[in-house]
Structures are given as structure tokens and as C-alpha cells.
UniProtKB/Swiss-Prot annotation:
Main function: Hydrolyzes diadenosine 5',5'''-P1,P4-tetraphosphate to yield ADP.
KW Hydrolase (keyword) present: yes
GO terms assigned for molecular function: bis(5'-nucleosyl)-tetraphosphatase (symmetrical) activity
Family designation: Belongs to the Ap4A hydrolase family.
Top-level EC class: hydrolase
Name of the protein in its database record: Bis(5'-nucleosyl)-tetraphosphatase, symmetrical
Record key words, sorted: Hydrolase
Gene3D superfamilies: 3.60.21.10
EC number: 3.6.1.41
A Pfam family it matches: Metallophos
Catalytic reaction(s) noted: P(1),P(4)-bis(5'-adenosyl) tetraphosphate + H2O = 2 ADP + 2 H(+)
Disulfide topology: none
Length: 288
């Protein structure tokens, strides 16, 4: 009975299969936690979603920014990008079922017994655990409602970038979504910086990685996150694990076994084409 964590899959189905076979994952007794960004950039997003859905209650997922973007494309809010390789998923006969299943997934997972917290990008030092749970619940509630397309319209905004209990409901949703799915750096006062994507030793002053600022949550929980592939799983404090190691970019898919803290990595099968191009997709299984 083991607990496994896997970093961002990004449609890398073959690598996912290989790493699960390597640890002899058994969905009847083991639990698999996934850091989000299940889809896009890799070649097999459809197969990844189908596989994860079949695993049922043995899997605990959080949504990443690419998963939310996929929902925005499916609803016709955003245009599909050829580099995401998601047309087979968007036009599949079971696309609607998969999209509905996806939007019912959480943005935060917490195991209070093991004292583990998982979010795709991380947790802002401005929150305590109760605020984090409340903000996650607000996002999950709107995603599961009929008005979720209206919410998806706003997920590309960078403001507000500072937490306050006085924020409006819409502003709370935007800030929380950026924390859970897009955040990397903060200013010393906790204010989010949504622009810098460099590795920490190249980031301009006074920016700090979110995990290097004092936090009541970090003091009490181990934190698992993905999103930040350029970290290569390194440079985080004790008890904080960054598991995105850029499989879709020709890097590796990373698995952490919680019980012995052993790290297993599977090399990407090939480097992906980073050239950005676009294909018009107008939602609900239609493409031009």
C-alpha cells in the first residue's frame, strides 16, 4: 500500500505508463497523486485523461493552468494552439464526458493525517490552511456550476496580486486561481509577481520563490507542487517537493514514493517542437 506523487504529465502517456509499471502501481491498494497539467504539449492528452479517469478513486488530482486552458478552449473562449496537441481530445466522441469529469476535479488536495498538501503551482504565504481550503472550495464550486464558462473568461488576468479579506468575490476567484495554478514568485510582502519565469538565481531582486517566504502552512505541511519545470525538482526547502521536470520538453517524468521518499524518473521519449502555431477550434467538438 504505497502513496505515489507524479509531476506534470502534459499528455506524455507512454512515459506515464512506463513509470507506473516500474513501481508496479496497483489501483486496488495504492494511491496516486498528480500535480496537474495532465494535458497539452505532449502527444497523447486524450489517452492520459482516459487512463486517469479509469483509475477512479485511486487517483487524487489537482487542476493546473493547462487543464483550465483546455476547458476554456473546449467552451470556445480561447483558440486552440497546435503546439498543445489537443485536437484529438477536443474532437473525441467522449470529449464532453472527459471535460465534465475534468472540471469536477479540485485545485487543492490535503491529507491531514499525513500532513500533505498538493497544489499545481503552490500556496501563497499570505494564507493559512483555512483560507487556502476556503479559496479552493470557491473555485471548485464555480467550475462545477453551469456558469463555469464565465469564470474561465477571467483566468488569464494577473490582478489582483495581493490577498485581502476585502476582495470582491470575482477578485478572490482570480487571485486564488493564480495562486493555485500560475504562481512562481512573490515580493517579500507576499504580493504575487506573474511575469518572471526565470530560475531563482536569475530572478531580479527583490523577487523570491513562493516557497522561500515564511508561511504557517509550510511550517505544518509537506507541500507537493508541479508547474515550475525549470527548477528540475531542485532548490526547494526540506518538506517541499517540486515534481515538474519537463517531460513534455524532452526532460523527465518524475515520481516520488512518499513512504521512503525515493525519486524515480523516466526520460522523455523525444523532445517536443516548441514552435508556436495555431489552429482555430470553435468549441464543443468542432474545428476549422
Amino acid at each position: 500500500m504505497s502513496t505515489y506523487f507524479i509531476g506534470d504529465i502534459h499528455g506524455c502517456y507512454d512515459e506515464l505508463q512506463t513509470i507506473l509499471e516500474k513501481v508496479a502501481f496497483d489501483p486496488l491498494i495504492d494511491t496516486l497523486w498528480l500535480t496537474g497539467d495532465l494535458v497539452a504539449r505532449g502527444p497523447s492528452s486524450l489517452e492520459v485523461l482516459r487512463m486517469i479517469r479509469r483509475l477512479g478513486n485511486s487517483v487524487r488530482i489537482v487542476l493546473g493552468n493547462h487543464d483550465l486552458h483546455l476547458l476554456a478552449v473546449y467552451t470556445g473562449i480561447m483558440r486552440n494552439r497546435i503546439k498543445d496537441h489537443t485536437i484529438p481530445l477536443l474532437t473525441a466522441p467522449d470529449a464532453e464526458d472527459l471535460m465534465n469529469w475534468l472540471r469536477y476535479q479540485p485545485v487543492l488536495q490535503v491529507d491531514n493525517k499525513k500532513k500533505i498538501l498538493m497544489a499545481h503551482a503552490g500556496i501563497t504565504p499570505q494564507w493559512n490552511i483555512d483560507t487556502a481550503l476556503q479559496c479552493a472550495s470557491e473555485i471548485e464550486t464555480v467550475l462545477r456550476s453551469e456558469s463555469y464558462p464565465l469564470f474561465l473568461h477571467s483566468i488569464y488576468e494577473d490582478i489582483p496580486n495581493y490577498w485581502s479579506n476585502e476582495l470582491s468575490y470575482r477578485a478572490r476567484l482570480q487571485f486564488s486561481t493564480n495562486v493555485f495554478t500560475r504562481m512562481r514568485y512573490c515580493f517579500p510582502n507576499g504580493k504575487l509577481d506573474m511575469l518572471c519565469k526565470d530560475i531563482p538565481n536569475k530572478a531580479p531582486e527583490p523577487l523570491r520563490p513562493w516557497f522561500n517566504l515564511p508561511s504557517t502552512i509550510v511550517e505544518k505541511y509537506s507541500i507537493i507542487f508541479g508547474h515550475w519545470s525549470s527548477l528540475l525538482g531542485k532548490g526547494t526547502p526540506t518538506g517541499i517537493y517540486g515534481l515538474d521536470t519537463g517531460c513534455c520538453w524532452g526532460g523527465k517524468l518524475t515520481l516520488l514514493c512518499w513512504e521512503d521518499k525515493k525519486i524515480i524518473q523516466i526520460p522523455s521519449q523525444k523532445k517536443r517542437n516548441k514552435k508556436c502555431s495555431y489552429l482555430c477550434y470553435n468549441g464543443k467538438g468542432k474545428k476549422n
